[in-house]
Amino acid sequence: MKIKKHKFPGVYVFIDEDGSEKIATKNLVPGQKVYGERLIKFEGEEYRVWNPRRSKLGAAILNGLKHFPIKPGSTVLYLGVASGTTASHVSDIVGWEGKVFGVEFSPRVLRELVPIVEERRNIVPILGDATKPEGYRALVPKVDVIFEDVAQPTQAKILIDNAKVFLKSGGYGMISVKSRSIDVTKEPEQVFKEVEKELATYFEVVERLSLEPYEKDHALFVVRKP
């Protein structure tokens, strides 16, 4: 068993006893599990194994993502934070110097995040509607990165609208697109091309990556605000 640094700062490669490689983050709150993930102790540090079947971002990294703008110290706006599975790994990466502002529409789901953020003080939970960024404008500063995981037909527009309000010039957006949430009648490839075209009206599209086999009919886009 061994842990080594990944090419992305704050991400680690965990080599299991059977030789298989997984990804992990250094646990910001040692002893805390967020979603039943495996905790690994190695050379005096504790790491959390990042499950790609529970996290679109984890799936993207394992699939060979080339651009990962979330770094130690980053300020991140997370749209569709849900109960915090992926956000907790982002929290590990950005560390105490960084901040994760997590917007969630469902009060019931956001309540599940409360016990996590009591110890992870770098996550700020916000009850809000990602389609209406003005509603949480007073709570969120300018950010380095926006990550969006909102399964809605207008998800590209949601990223653009939030970037106009919150994203620094030169900052990055990351969006997980589920083709069936946009149009079930079209082939996923057609949907992804249309999303890319819409994103390109405002951003420079830096990368597009399939999330198969972890997520069916999903792609992750990385974009940059000029």
Curated annotation (Swiss-Prot):
Gene Ontology biological process terms in this record:
box C/D sno(s)RNA 3'-end processing; tRNA processing
Q: Which UniProt keywords apply?
A: Methyltransferase, RNA-binding, rRNA processing, Transferase, tRNA processing
What's the Enzyme Commission number for this chain? 2.1.1.-
Residues involved in S-adenosyl-L-methionine binding? T85, T86, E104, F105, D129, A130, D149, V150, A151, Q152
Pfam families, sorted: Fibrillarin
Enzyme class label? transferase
Give any GO molecular function from the UniProt entry. rRNA methyltransferase activity
Is RNA-binding among this UniProt entry's keywords?
A: yes
The record's comment on protein family reads: Belongs to the methyltransferase superfamily. Fibrillarin family.
User: What does the UniProt record say this protein does?
Assistant: Involved in pre-rRNA and tRNA processing. Utilizes the methyl donor S-adenosyl-L-methionine to catalyze the site-specific 2'-hydroxyl methylation of ribose moieties in rRNA and tRNA. Site specificity is provided by a guide RNA that base pairs with the substrate. Methylation occurs at a characteristic distance from the sequence involved in base pairing with the guide RNA.
According to the record's subunit comment, the protein's assembly and interactions are: Interacts with nop5. Component of box C/D small ribonucleoprotein (sRNP) particles that contain rpl7ae, FlpA and nop5, plus a guide RNA.
Name of protein = Fibrillarin-like rRNA/tRNA 2'-O-methyltransferase
The organism is Thermococcus onnurineus (strain NA1)
Give the taxonomic lineage as stored in the record. Archaea, Methanobacteriati, Methanobacteriota, Thermococci, Thermococcales
Q: What gene makes this protein?
A: flpA
